[in-house]
């Protein structure tokens, strides 16, 4: 049985080469079938490209996507389920505004209050964006993936089988095999032709479902932008009120303080009680030129070793997106600890993940890791 199958594969390969190299004529299918094949091939490319571009549309930062993929891969290898969400730009900007608005102090600064209001609004927009992501993934990307893995895969399987049976049928005819062999090959060829035609027709005539998915996508985008517009409208009104409040506040007068106001005596600064410079003896030797203290110079530029860092024990060549490659003895700045076995770090202007076993920590991270 295995020999018969091998012989059939050899015959099909021989027929294929005879058609390509020897100019032999194979069975030609009609123009309608060839047009369905062309449209099916375009659909295969469309579904693949549409999924890719939709994911890029929802998560446009390639570095963030690479980090998420790397963390997901590391979590699978370590057997730890680690949740990792895409950092929405609205959320990052919101965190910045909220942090510094609170540091400025909301009690005495209208600007600080406005920053906090802006940050809260951006935070709401980030939540709306997460809802959009979930909606698109569930109602648009998942149906496309199902279509790719089931419908398209099945149609392409029937087409591949049709090509093989067509070659087998033409080979038997060309070699003038027995009538029953030719008839059996023809029956299988006809069966595959029927399955391939029906599969492609059903795929291409399913416009209602495909357009419905596009409608769902458009509705999700419309809801997202409508909710964001509502948030921004409320924010605009609030900021207008804050501006009016800032304009109506009386301007505080400010008088800079002198050294006397700060209760500093004149002993070390060359000042006497009335604020006039003290007299210096003419016989006194001139003072040397002022020089910068080495200790102060050291304080201005902190040593690199004060930063969390490690030294590479071996060369590490990255195998996955998001990993950081380095050479032996490289000094790597530590940024974060992913888990018990992996660090996130930076070297030579590049950032990424690398295994702990390849390095020796010289200055640990602040949390003791």
UniProtKB/Swiss-Prot annotation:
Primary localization class, coarse: cytoplasm
Region (Disordered): 275-296
GO terms for cellular component: cytoplasm; glutamatergic synapse; membrane; presynapse
Listed InterPro entries: AH/BAR_dom_sf, BAR_dom, Endophilin_A_SH3, Endophilin_SH3RF, SH3-like_dom_sf, SH3_domain
Keywords: Coiled coil, Cytoplasm, Endocytosis, Membrane, Phosphoprotein, SH3 domain
Any coiled-coil regions, as ranges: 227-247
GO biological process: regulation of synapse structure or activity; synaptic vesicle endocytosis; synaptic vesicle uncoating
PROSITE patterns in the cross-refs: BAR, SH3
Official protein name in the record: Endophilin-A
Organism: Drosophila pseudoobscura pseudoobscura
Species classification: Eukaryota, Metazoa, Ecdysozoa, Arthropoda, Hexapoda
